[in-house]
Amino acid sequence: MEDLKTVEASDNVVSDNVEKVNPELIDSTIRESNIQSATKVDNIPQSQTDTEETQQSQTDTEETQQSQTDDTTGNAKIYVDDTFSPSDAATAAVLTGKDSTSTTIVEEVMEPDEIGLPSVKITEAATGTARNGGGSPRTVSSPRFSGSPVSTGTPKNVDSHRGLIDTAAPFESVKEAVSKFGGITDWKSHRMQAVERRKLIEEELKKIHEEIPEYKTHSETAEAAKLQVLKELESTKRLIEQLKLNLDKAQTEEQQAKQDSELAKLRVEEMEQGIAEDVSVAAKAQLEVAKARHTTAITELSSVKEELETLHKEYDALVQDKDVAVKKVEEAMLASKEVEKTVEELTIELIATKESLESAHASHLEAEEQRIGAAMARDQDTHRWEKELKQAEEELQRLNQQIHSSKDLKSKLDTASALLLDLKAELVAYMESKLKQEACDSTTNTDPSTENMSHPDLHAAVASAKKELEEVNVNIEKAAAEVSCLKLASSSLQLELEKEKSTLASIKQREGMASIAVASIEAEIDRTRSEIASVQSKEKDAREKMVELPKQLQQAAEEADEAKSLAEVAREELRKAKEEAEQAKAGASTMESRLFAAQKEIEAAKASERLALAAIKALEESESTLKANDTDSPRSVTLSLEEYYELSKRAHEAEELANARVAAAVSRIEEAKETEMRSLEKLEEVNRDMDARKKALKEATEKAEKAKEGKLGVEQELRKWRAEHEQKRKAGDGVNTEKNLKESFEGGKMEQSPEAVVYASSPSESYGTEENSETNLSPQTKSRKKKKKLSFPRFFMFLSKKKSHNN
């Protein structure tokens, strides 16, 4: 891949037109390398017949420019290959058959963020052409010859460190160049082969990716087997240690037995020789050995006692830890039980608050209904009372009118009585005067009028006087009758006035009672409002408690979980303490074995990593070779050994850098896999938590639905009870109204008297007013109006009779 990229970069650098190159870079590269090699690159065209001076002038003017060619023009070319050797350069020079001396200029063409091999650009100073035979078929400064690096054909006025660029076309076509160097001309088939190889490589990669999980399972099984083997190894090591201890004991016992046998032999020899015990060396040696054994036994006993004491201390510490852990577990269990109790109490309180809230809500609804009913009844009563008050006022106005009419009648009666008295006085005076006149007529006849008066005139005067007297008497009787009628009317009107006053007093009393009832109803309404406010405050408190209850329940559940976790932690600590006590004896050996196994694992991992890197490197090399074969160009370069070594060194460094990058990529891949595994584990944990929460939410929703169903059932029962209660109340109200109507009707009948009172009003007005007001009155007022209806016609009949009689 890198070779192809460098070749593409070099192809981008080379063009048909000659471009400028930094002369400082050329001089620095020449001074660093100090190499001048004459390389045979390409053929000079036949049309080129310029001399050395013209070429020198061209190189002087164009020495800071680069040559770039394509497949058709064929100017000086750049070719980079890590497998290039000096022999290839020599063969290229022989094939071209051109004598030229040139200096090589090394120029690195690098792409960003890529490591590529340096590209080599060849500049040459031509001394002749193939046509005039000025060139030599073999270069003087070839790596195969040891000579001067300076070309013999270089002009004197040109610096030896300055190179010349040949812009001639080396080949007529790409096919010719490829056929000269033994390349491949069937590019399509080559590309197809490259594509097939790439597909094969991709399939192999897919197979490798598919085999990765199998290898993972194999590695897991191998790790499990390794753990089992390690356990067996630990057990065998323990057995080996025990056997070693037993062997040491047996060896010490054997040595002691040997010492005892040797001392016994010495003692037997001394006894045979007759040496006493006080002087014998064997006895002394036995005594010293016994003392030494005694001291060693004492030291061992003391060490064993110390070990026992330490073990007892450790055991006591473990027992204390166990007791502490057990206490912690018990405390945690007690805390969890208390939390459960608190949760139960809170649930009971929640249920009680819900019930109280429902009852308060029901009482609130009842109070609202009562308040609405009381308000409606109060409105109806006030409306009825207003109507009754208006009727009473109208009746009072009528009574006032009747009183005024009675007063007018009294005044008329007084005037009539005064006229009657005057008439009586006039009659008496007339009678006296008439008697006197008759007396005078009978005694004396001196008056001419009386004398001349005839007898029939006197009879006519007497008759007229009698008629006048009769008329006066009739008028007197009429006036007396009218006076009696007026007296009766005034008495009846006084009675009616007294009755109206009593009814007005009763109405005022009713109004007072109604005001008292209204005040009591208002007080009850205020009380119900205060109760409603208290119920609403209780509802708010209950809602706040209901809002806080889930939090408290959650907190209690969290505390219970914490207590359970503490209990589990305490149990785990106890178990770990026991395991640590058991593993304290063989800790060192197990640690060594683990370290050894870890080292082995590290080495195996490194080896597998190396194998993977080698495989990746081989794949990359195969791809690079394939692509290099795909992009074979007809360019060849002859380099010196030092340049080749430097290039190979750089290639090796590039390979190392690539390997380092591959290793870093592998490590990143492993880290990514680890992070992926961790994320998957976290995802599984989150999924578990989500499942648990979903289950809890489902249970909570089921409980809420059950509670709602219960609430709906209670509300339905409450509605049924209210409907039944309303029906009963309506039935009772209907019965009461019927009773009141019956009582009022009977009372009206009892109150009707045979002596009806007449009123000064027309029949049409009385009937019209009664018919309009009858619909909006209570039963009592209806009964009273019936009595008035019965009395009014009699009154009008009496007045009509009186008028007809007067006429």
UniProtKB/Swiss-Prot annotation:
Phenotype reported upon loss of the gene: Deficient chloroplast response.
PTM sites of type Phosphoserine: 148
Residue ranges with Polar residues bias: 31-40, 138-157, 761-781
Region (Disordered): 1-162, 532-565, 722-789
Alphabetic keyword roster: Coiled coil, Cytoplasm, Phosphoprotein
UniProt note on tissues of expression: Ubiquitous but preferentially in chloroplast-containing tissues.
One GO cellular component term: peroxisome
InterPro entries associated with the record: Web
Annotated compartments: Cytoplasm
UniProt record, GO biological process: chloroplast accumulation movement; chloroplast avoidance movement
Transmembrane spans: none
Segments of skewed composition (Basic and acidic residues): 537-548, 722-732, 739-749
Broad class of where this protein is predominantly found: cytoplasm
Compositionally biased region (Low complexity): 46-73
Coiled coil: 191-429, 457-489, 516-621, 664-724
Family membership noted in the UniProt record: Belongs to the WEB family.
Summary of the function given for this chain in its UniProt record: Required for the chloroplast avoidance response under high intensity blue light. This avoidance response consists in the relocation of chloroplasts on the anticlinal side of exposed cells. Acts in association with PMI2 to maintain the velocity of chloroplast photorelocation movement via cp-actin filaments regulation.
Record note on quaternary structure: Interacts with PMI2.
UniProt name for this protein: Protein WEAK CHLOROPLAST MOVEMENT UNDER BLUE LIGHT 1
Organism: Arabidopsis thaliana
